[in-house]
């Protein structure tokens, strides 16, 4: 059954030269209205992720959603940026030591040492974040941890979807990552959009033909909620490559908000990351890796059953292990909300396993392969495949930790 009953008006095709707002992303001619300062270069449209997603899996049945059925849905990916088998023997640290410093296995870096290794990062000025206010932080984080449990979607909601699969969720979320990056939206906007999709699908069934509409509408809603200057609805519609109209998105927006009872409360995992980062001395390197590892949540449905506070804590725990930043101290346990090391290892293992699978999320990988994110995706893929290979069981290599170190209680 279709999710929305909408009849598209005649002549509703979007004219890419006709619309305007503060975040104009298309058009070769100067617009007659608006200010010049708010317009972006028209060269930007070359990389716009404008397309109809999931159109190549329209015949995939619910019961045939294995790797063979969804082969056409996987977009090509150039793995030239990753090390080859011959390069795997080279120390990963030597390639990215200027960006991400990996301490020796027996090192116990102090907070003062980590402060010297800080790099420029968009989250450096955490003091301006009201959630980090010392006077109110305990009450604030107690509230958002309760909210975190309230906002959990049904981790098995795909069982009630007749036409959708988890693979389709990955494809949709990767497309949203592309749009999110091209629109230069806040990180919180992406997480809220995905949470809206997951919570909505936990309550309602959705047809494959309306799945992209659900995704783009969720991103629009999240943008209105989080952004200071939200892109116009025409911008979002344009990204669907004519698959939907402005009216379609407006109807979907009203319907989705009614299903969610207009409740858009959602604690971003970045709030928990920043809290832990504060406890460890604001090490921007571990925090950057933590952001990358946390975003795996968008593509691995096994993480849906965990609250975002625990996923963020596990991401920081794993990033510290990968960079050998020392043990998970009582101070870090307290700042994470009380999560002990043994409670985080299961999630850390899921994150490790993600990197032992073939790469297929191009937009996600490329996003974190930039200098802005310290080439975190390249670094982690190479390091995990070296140090935590699924086929590795020996502990003889003194330069790495045993493959079981994240699954057993021992160190």
Curated annotation (Swiss-Prot):
Associates with cdc2, res2 and rum1. Interacts with pop1 only when phosphorylated. It is found in: Nucleus; Cytoplasm, Cytoskeleton, Microtubule organizing center, Spindle pole body. GO terms for molecular function: cyclin-dependent protein serine/threonine kinase activator activity; cyclin-dependent protein serine/threonine kinase regulator activity. GO terms for cellular component: chromatin; cyclin-dependent protein kinase holoenzyme complex; cytoplasm; microtubule organizing center; mitotic spindle pole body; nucleus. Belongs to the cyclin family. Cyclin AB subfamily. This is G2/mitotic-specific cyclin cig2. Residues 64-78 have a biased composition (Basic and acidic residues). A motif (Destruction box) lies at residues 51-60. Changing residue 329 to A: No effect on protein stability. Induction: Highly induced upon nitrogen starvation and during conjugation. Keywords: Cell cycle, Cell division, Conjugation, Cyclin, Cytoplasm, Cytoskeleton, Mitosis, Nucleus, Phosphoprotein. Residues 57-89 are annotated as: Disordered. InterPro entries: Cyclin, Cyclin-like_dom, Cyclin-like_sf, Cyclin_A/B-like, Cyclin_C-dom, Cyclin_N, Cyclins_cyclin-box. Phosphorylated. One of its GO terms (biological process) is positive regulation of G1/S transition of mitotic cell cycle. The gene is cig2. Its main location: nucleus. Essential for the control of the cell cycle at the G2/M and G1/S (mitosis) transition. Interacts with the cdc2 protein kinase to form MPF. Interaction with res2 promotes the phosphorylation of res1 and inhibits MBF-dependent gene transcription. Forms an autoregulating feedback-inhibition loop with MBF which is important for normal regulation of the cell cycle. G2/M cyclins accumulate steadily during G2 and are abruptly destroyed at mitosis. Negatively regulates conjugation via interacting with cell cycle 'start' genes. Degraded by skp1, pop1 and pop2 in the G2 and M phases of the cell cycle. Residues 181-273 are annotated as: Interaction with pop1. Residues 139-265 form the Cyclin N-terminal domain. It holds the Pfam family Cyclin_N.
